[in-house]
Design a protein with these regions (language model features):
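Glycan-processing catalytic domains of CAZymes
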Residues: 1-183, 192-193
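Carbohydrate-binding surface patches
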Residues: 174-219
Length: 219
């Protein structure tokens, strides 16, 4: 057989799909960012979709992906992550703090998270898998997070310029460790942007984080 450069074939495939169904919305999965630039470069997809795995397991990897996608899509395409939480946990409930921290980071960085399928939260690339359940508290919290993302989507997802912001805790008794992005364990990490003339500051709570991986593998 002949060697095939798969990312290059993405272009003709996507263009053929759009040509056949010009009235349909179109997206293609860049698994582990494979072919992301070629997919974005077609100008035929409605957003960029990244399924992230162990080779992109850290919160800083999410930041890197979003910056790259921003360039690939000429600052016009937004990013949705397929990121399966608590992947190695065999049964029980999702770990609520891990779920919400990952959501908070993704939203702050300008991305969003495909994490619900049908009537359940996704723990696997096999979407019907329901081995993990959402607690009632998590169900309530997720709705509030989505309400927040929807209400403030212009500030979260309209681009802007990243700013380095130094924060100082004025209450010495709190003894809080504050740092600017990238995140650190046992710290509150700030991430700031200037969006449409407004300064947007996110405070991401890593005070009790036991790792800097979004995956929270074992919950």
């Amino acid at each position: 057989g002949n060697k095939v450069n798969l990312p290059k074939t993405y272009v003709s495939f996507i263009e053929a799909m759009k040509g056949k169904h010009p009235d349909k919305r179109l997206v293609m999965n860049a698994v582990s960012s494979y072919g992301a630039s070629q997919i974005a470069g077609t100008g035929k997809v409605d957003f960029l979709y990244n399924e992230v795995w162990g080779d992109e397991a850290d919160f800083t990897d999410l930041y890197t992906i979003l910056k790259a996608n921003h360039q690939y899509g000429n600052q016009a395409l937004k990013t949705v992550f397929a990121a399966y939480m608590n992947y190695e946990k065999g049964s029980g409930e999702f770990n609520m703090p891990g779920i919400l921290l990952t959501a908070a980071v993704m939203f702050a960085l300008g991305g969003s998270h495909l994490e619900l399928g049908g009537d359940h939260m996704l723990c696997s690339e096999y979407f019907p898998n329901t081995r993990l359940q959402m607690s009632d508290a998590l169900k309530t919290a997720v709705v509030r997070y989505y309400d927040f993302m929807t209400a403030y989507q212009n500030l979260l997802r309209d681009g802007g310029e990243e700013e380095k912001l130094t924060l100082v805790c004025t209450d010495a008794s709190k003894n809080l460790n504050l740092n600017t992005w990238p995140p650190q364990k046992s710290a509150i990490t700030s991430f700031a942007r200037r969006v449409n003339g407004k300064q947007v500051v996110h405070l991401l709570n890593f005070l009790s984080a036991n790792s800097l991986s979004w995956r929270d593998l074992n919950g």
